[in-house]
């Protein structure tokens, strides 16, 4: 008998699994609280943090590129910096995030993640306000864009018998180029008293989500900066000698930390696999023993993302390294469909394709775009991407690397993966041909070279953003039912930070105002409906009427004005059309013909306006629902904030006022969006970047229009990013990229999908995969939320694959250890 059958189907399996694990998840709080109470047995040397010797010189006396923190002549060897660690691992979708939620709710802790997507996802899960967004662990300890090009170095290893003290120094030495730069800047900032208190001074409990994708030396880097910052600012944590507790969360069988190096002289890139934090804590005897992993390991067992019993059993066999019995291999056969079916973009349109390599993803997009171009050209958007190369800086760069024959175009093609988010250019259908032109200034001088490429996207396709991007939410597109549900639940208001609440109320009022006329224009509207609509009580709003009396009907509104003249709605309609719609005029717009500026009203007045419009809107909705027996609610509502908006056949969305007025928001990587189109109109709050040359706007720089999962429409700001390369300690700002920071979610690599929950998945393992790994099979198949929505071109378990799950024996050993906390 299944658990759910005991409850008569009242609760689903996912709910029951989460509830059954809740009591033990709460025990994690006690475990972390206990570890975070540890204190130093003795004090660290006084002022140890002001002048620190490069740890590499302790292993290699002939090391020529030593970098000391502070003043070289005062530098002393780095003392050992103690720490505690707790390991929280589990199968995909097992509920590890629940443990983070519980810790955040019950303890004063610093919650971080290793990637932007994971950080934004946690911000959503924890319902963090704009001012308290979860940061990446890199940003938390002070990493910034100037450190991207700083190379990691190899540490000299004298022998294999290493203590934890030596291991810590060797790990820090690998990352010392970055560490020393951040530390020197922090010392300078304190001297100038310009630095705010760093995040690592807030608590001794530091949570790192998705710890399986960062290299092991980052663990010791976090420990170093905890002690460094707290010593620098003389915090109570430091004065009391509180030892940091690092909570490392992730799935060790999904770990995939990479070491990337770039040779400026040859312009060649080298990528190889490194040892991640989770693997180091589990497999490294020295580190594992010091952190007492045998006593400090929590394992989540059941997959709660997909509660299908057979599928969960299959995933657990891979997770724990159990032998794959013939019946399990036969079980996977049911997901197989022909490769030609999966590779045809016209099949399974709403399904996300996963591939092993970036080239396969790119080829799929090209095939998809070719078909769309033939079947419906207007659904294929082609957007320009610009790269501004600084000519003088490029010449200085050539001199520094000693490659005087290097030209801009070959350099660009070799470095495009470094100029912005790798997957954006590695996966997408970016034009092979590039256009180079020199930007000539008014005095005739040439300082920059402009490179133009083109990027393709499909209308109504699923997209994501590569980083947190400023946007202006301007409208709504969805059913009437959905919009009324949002109004009644106040979901939009709840998801808005407190400091933005007045703007949220004003924005929703503008949407209701713009959509109110649609009740009279609906195909379901009858004379009886119109009479009932006219009988709806519309209270007098004193401040609105006084505002109207101050407005002359002849005054022209400016682009940034929130006033809205409903007469614009009827542009293009004849008098006969208007009479057929409503011969007596809509009483709503007779009483409330204009909306005042948000900044001219108090919060109480905006709230009253919102409540009044909401009551009228819902009353009109109820009337039409009653007369149509619920059919009206299923119809489409498209409304924009205080604006009339139209769409051209080519996908361009334009305002009749030549300007969009919306609510300032942000698009984040954790969310899914639909590409609605693009606009060339002005967007209030976004404006133009004055640092960019005007030639870009003359050539064309559209903004993308997207829709979120709730149905709200936003205009994305353009993404401007700088590429700074570091060679021999010298920084070179070589390029500024102007693009859209978007990636299609129609297809991606299996590696990139890690950590995502996907409704429908189609995996293409290739025709004859040479480097197929068990971890790739596991990650790809475990993304799906329902195995009925999973298809694959082959059964990968019947192919030759590398069993790279070297963690499994350690997990099995931990499962047998009575000190391991198991959460089912």
From Swiss-Prot:
It is found in: Host nucleus. One of its GO terms (biological process) is DNA replication. CDD domains: SF1_C_RecD. SUPFAM superfamilies: P-loop containing nucleoside triphosphate hydrolases. Its main location: host cell. GO terms for cellular component: host cell nucleus. It is an enzyme of class 3 (hydrolase). GO terms for molecular function: ATP binding; helicase activity; hydrolase activity. ATP binds at residues 90-97. Pfam families: Herpes_Helicase. It comes from the Viruses. Keywords: ATP-binding, DNA replication, Helicase, Host nucleus, Hydrolase, Nucleotide-binding. Its EC number is 3.6.4.-. InterPro entries: DNA_helicase_dom, HSV_HELI, P-loop_NTPase. Component of the helicase/primase complex. Unwinds the DNA at the replication forks and generates single-stranded DNA for both leading and lagging strand synthesis. The primase synthesizes short RNA primers on the lagging strand that the polymerase elongates using dNTPs. Possesses helicase-like motifs and therefore may act as the helicase subunit of the complex. Associates with the primase and the primase-associated factor to form the helicase-primase complex. Belongs to the herpesviridae helicase family. This is DNA replication helicase. It comes from Human herpesvirus 6A (strain Uganda-1102) (HHV-6 variant A). The lineage of its organism: Viruses, Duplodnaviria, Heunggongvirae, Peploviricota, Herviviricetes.
């Amino acid at each position: 008998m299944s658990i759910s059958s005991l409850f008569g189907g009242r609760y689903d399996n996912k709910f029951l699994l989460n509830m059954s694990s809740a009591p033990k998840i709460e025990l994690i709080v006690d475990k972390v609280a206990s570890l975070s109470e540890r204190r130093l047995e003795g004090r660290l040397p006084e002022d140890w943090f002001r002048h620190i010797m490069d740890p590499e010189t302790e292993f290699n006396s002939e090391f020529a590129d030593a970098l000391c923190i502070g003043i070289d002549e005062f530098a002393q060897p780095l003392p050992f910096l103690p720490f505690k660690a707790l390991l929280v691992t589990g199968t995909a979708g097992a509920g590890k995030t629940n443990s983070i939620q519980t810790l955040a709710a019950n303890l004063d802790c610093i919650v971080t993640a290793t990637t932007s997507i994971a950080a934004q996802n946690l911000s959503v899960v924890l319902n963090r306000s704009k001012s308290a967004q979860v940061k990446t662990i890199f940003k938390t300890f002070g990493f910034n864009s100037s450190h991207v090009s700083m190379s990691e170095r190899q540490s000299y290893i004298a022998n294999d018998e290493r203590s934890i003290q030596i291991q810590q120094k060797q790990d820090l030495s690998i990352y010392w180029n970055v560490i020393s730069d951040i530390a020197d800047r922090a010392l300078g900032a304190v001297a100038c008293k310009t630095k705010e208190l760093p995040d690592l001074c807030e608590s001794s409990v530091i949570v790192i989500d998705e710890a399986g994708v960062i290299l092991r030396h980052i663990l010791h880097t976090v420990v170093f900066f905890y002690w460094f910052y707290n010593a620098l600012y003389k915090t109570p944590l430091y004065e009391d000698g509180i030892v940091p507790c690092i909570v490392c969360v992730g799935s060790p069988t999904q770990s995939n930390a990479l070491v990337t190096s770039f040779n400026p002289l040859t312009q060649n890139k080298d990528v190889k696999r490194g040892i991640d934090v989770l693997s180091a804590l589990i497999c490294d005897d020295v580190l594992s023993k010091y952190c007492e992993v045998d006593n400090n390991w929590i394992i989540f067992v059941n997959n709660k993302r997909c509660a299908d019993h057979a599928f969960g059993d299959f995933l657990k066999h891979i997770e724990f390294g159990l032998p794959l019995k013939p019946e399990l291999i036969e079980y996977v056969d049911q997901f197989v469909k022909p490769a030609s079916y999966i590779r045809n973009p016209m099949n399974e349109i709403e399904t996300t394709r996963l591939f092993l390599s970036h080239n396969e993803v790119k080829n799929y997009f090209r095939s998809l775009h070719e078909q769309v171009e033939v079947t419906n050209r207007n659904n294929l958007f082609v957007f320009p991407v610009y790269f501004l190369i600084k000519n003088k800086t490029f010449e200085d760069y050539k001199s520094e690397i000693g490659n005087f024959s290097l030209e801009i175009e070959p350099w660009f093609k070799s470095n495009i993966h470094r100029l912005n988010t790798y997957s954006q250019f590695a996966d997408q259908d970016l034009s092979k041909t590039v256009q180079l032109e020199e930007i000539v200034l008014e005095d005739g001088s040439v300082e920059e070279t402009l490179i133009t490429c083109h990027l393709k996207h499909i209308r109504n396709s699923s997209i994501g953003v590569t980083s947190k991007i400023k946007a202006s939410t301007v409208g709504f597109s969805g059913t009437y039912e959905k919009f009324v549900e949002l109004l009644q639940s106040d979901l939009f208001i709840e998801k808005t930070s407190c400091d933005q609440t007045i703007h949220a109320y004003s924005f929703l009022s503008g949407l209701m105002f713009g959509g109110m006329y649609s009740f009279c224009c609906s195909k379901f509207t009858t004379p009886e409906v119109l009479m009932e609509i006219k009988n709806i009580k519309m209270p007098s709003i004193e401040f609105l009427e006084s505002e109207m009396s101050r407005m002359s009907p002849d005054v022209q509104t400016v682009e940034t004005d929130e006033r809205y003249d409903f007469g614009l709605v009827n542009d293009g309609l004849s008098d006969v059309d208007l009479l057929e719609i409503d011969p007596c005029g809509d009483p709503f717009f007779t009483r409330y013909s204009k909306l005042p500026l948000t900044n001219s009203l108090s919060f109480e007045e905006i709230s009253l306006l919102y409540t009044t419009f909401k009551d009228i809107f819902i009353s009109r909705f109820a009337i039409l629902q009653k007369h149509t027996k619920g059919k009206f609610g299923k119809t489409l509502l498209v409304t924009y904030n205080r604006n009339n908006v139209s769409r051209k056949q080519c996908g361009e969305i334009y305002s009749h006022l030549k300007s969009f007025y919306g609510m300032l928001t942000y698009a984040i990587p954790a969310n899914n969006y639909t590409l609605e189109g693009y606009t060339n109109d002005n967007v209030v709050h976004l404006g133009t970047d004055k640092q960019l040359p005007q030639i870009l706007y003359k050539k064309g720089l559209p903004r993308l229009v997207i829709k979120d999962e709730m149905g709200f429409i936003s205009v994305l700001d353009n993404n401007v990013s700088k590429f700074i390369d570091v060679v021999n300690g010298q920084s070179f700002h070589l390029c500024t990229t102007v693009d859209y920071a978007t990636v299609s979610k129609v297809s991606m690599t299996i590696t990139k999908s890690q950590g995502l929950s996907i409704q429908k998945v189609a995996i293409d393992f290739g025709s004859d995969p040479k480097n197929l790994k068990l971890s790739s099979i596991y990650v790809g198949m475990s993304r799906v939320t329902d195995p009925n929505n999973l298809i694959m071109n082959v059964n990968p378990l019947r192919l030759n694959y590398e069993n790279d799950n070297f963690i499994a024996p350690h997990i099995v050993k931990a499962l047998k250890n009575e000190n391991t906390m198991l959460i089912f």
